A protein has these predicted regions:
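Non-catalytic structural scaffold of enzyme domains
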Residues: 3, 8-252
Length: 252
């Protein structure tokens, strides 16, 4: 279901607060980042005491099964597995939901059609940020599925008119392999960071005005100082958009 007008799951101090649904664990390290950013922003926006926290529910499935079906090209199965988690979110009272992972948005059409909740797509807040900052040509680092697929590149190009450059050859291999062999397991190695810096530099040499960190684990490894152009982290953009959505009525 496309994201629509904000509803209201409950009243807090006479204000409407929506419950955020998160399909996480894909992989678990970045789900922690979502949880931290969302709660920090809610605490910041709802009061000076810093004790407010988000209304949210989290569901996840076994990442090994997700990864195996990705590798086998069974995106329909990925969609089924994640849609099951979406149903759990709805039953738990979520008002809308997000996928805390870029790559599984490859199956977004399966999931969005199967889950009876508004869906906050990761690409849209990322594109909004890129456009607001005046970028027209952007580089992309992500899993191989993300860099060669259509859900992110196609959406940025067709819906938002952005030109997208993706890592190629050795750089694409290094980034993809690091994701599944290290980052998804919570391992962040200096040598791998250097490979990412080289991939970023290559994108900049081809004309990238900014580089999208198009995997929710990448921001745990790469830092702003690793790039000569701005880095746009999809995790941050997505988490901020979730809070914006949840608190829309509260802050009117």
């Amino acid at each position: 279901m496309a994201l629509g007008t904000a509803g209201c799951s409950r009243i807090r101090d006479d204000d409407c607060v929506e419950t955020i649904g998160i399909i996480g664990g894909i992989a678990w390290p970045s789900t922690i980042v979502y949880y931290r950013i969302i709660n920090e922003l809610v605490a910041e926006r709802l009061g000076d005491d810093g004790l407010h926290s988000a209304d949210l529910v989290l569901a996840q499935t076994d990442f090994e099964e997700i990864e195996r079906n990705q590798r086998e090209g069974r995106w329909d199965r990925v969609g089924v597995l994640l849609a099951e988690q979406g149903a759990r979110l709805k039953a738990a009272g979520a008002d809308f939901f997000l996928l805390a992972c870029n790559t599984v948005h490859t199956a977004d059409h399966y999931i969005e059609n199967a889950v009876d909740l508004p869906f906050l797509h990761i690409v849209d807040p990322t594109a909004d940020q890129l456009i607001a900052r005046g970028f027209s040509t952007v580089g992309l680092l992500g899993s191989r599925y993300t860099m060669t697929g259509d859900y992110l590149v196609g959406r940025l190009q067709k819906w938002y008119g952005l030109s997208v450059l993706v890592a190629e050859g050795e750089h694409q291999d290094n980034v993809h392999n690091a994701l599944y062999q290290e980052l998804a397991k919570g391992e962040f190695l200096p040598g791998t960071r250097n490979k990412f810096k080289a991939a970023i530099a290559e994108l900049i040499s081809r004309g990238a005005e900014a580089v999208i960190l198009g995997c929710t684990e990448f921001g745990l490894l790469v830092r702003p100082e690793d790039s000569a152009v701005p880095l746009v982290d999809t995790t941050v953009a997505h988490a901020v958009a979730a809070v914006d959505r949840a608190l829309t009525s509260t802050l009117l």
